[in-house]
């Protein structure tokens, strides 16, 4: 989630890369991406081919954290992804947050910037085309193992004239495309809590985290849903922003 130059990266000459190794379903299931937040990791894990939705207060920060962690080697709870794809449907890419997490993990800011590919979409049509047509090509071309989609439904929430029938049809198409993509790579998206159309998609995510501010300042509650099971944990904002020392 760094720099506007990343948006133009897709227009540069194709990078010569080796073909990805064929991964079996068992291999994909064994690989796990950790949030590096023990209270969350103890209840939910993200496989190399998986789908998760984050909503509520601090959702973008959590996606930024996962974006950087996806680049880490597997022995550190990452996916060792050559590149991470950020399909920004809300214009919420967090440059400062990305740099901050890269610094905490001792990673080169330049290396992180070069390995995070950002493409923005602003209209419903652009979002659908990006997710259903462009993302599968980018995933294949750059050996992407992690796709981050901030603000999945923002374009719908900001369109005042789109008919509900058309909204449901487009959301169904986008959800179907995301499900197909998550059979190949990890896809993590965010949906605005209380958004006009959030109820149309939240039920489609078997893995989901909803973040709520507590009355006590500097704390929040995480409602975690994992394939039919659920758990509520209390967290501090510091646990979201600062990685634990090992």
Give a label for each model feature.
Residues 63-68, 128-132, 171-175:
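Short, hydrophobic/amphipathic alpha-helical packing segments
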Residues 49-50, 81, 113, 182, ...:
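Short, well-ordered alpha-helix to beta-strand connector turns
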Residues 176-246:
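Phosphate-binding/switch region of NTP-binding enzymes
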């Amino acid at each position: 989630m760094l720099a506007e130059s990343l948006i133009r990266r897709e227009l540069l000459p194709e990078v010569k890369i080796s073909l990805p190794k064929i991964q079996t379903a068992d291999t994909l299931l064994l690989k796990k991406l950790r949030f590096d937040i023990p209270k969350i990791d103890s209840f939910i894990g993200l496989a190399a081919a998986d789908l998760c939705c984050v909503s509520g207060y601090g959702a973008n920060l959590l996606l930024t954290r996962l974006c950087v962690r996806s680049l880490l080697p597997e022995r550190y709870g990452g996916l060792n992804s050559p590149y991470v794809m950020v399909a920004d449907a809300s214009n919420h890419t967090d440059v400062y947050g990305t740099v901050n997490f890269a610094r905490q993990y001792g990673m080169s800011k330049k290396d992180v910037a070069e390995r995070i590919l950002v493409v923005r979409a602003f209209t419903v049509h652009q979002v659908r085309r990006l997710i259903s047509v462009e993302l599968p090509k980018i995933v294949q071309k750059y050996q992407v193992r992690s796709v981050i989609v901030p603000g999945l439904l923002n374009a719908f929430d900001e369109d005042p004239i789109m008919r509900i029938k058309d909204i449901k049809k487009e959301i169904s198409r986008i959800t179907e495309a995301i499900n197909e993509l998550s059979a190949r790579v990890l896809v993590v998206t965010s949906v605005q809590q209380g958004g006009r159309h959030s109820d149309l998609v939240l039920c489609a995510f078997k893995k989901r985290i909803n973040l709520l501010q507590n009355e006590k300042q500097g704390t929040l509650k995480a409602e975690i849903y994992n394939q039919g099971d659920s758990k509520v944990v209390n967290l501090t904002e510091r646990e979201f922003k600062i990685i634990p020392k090992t």
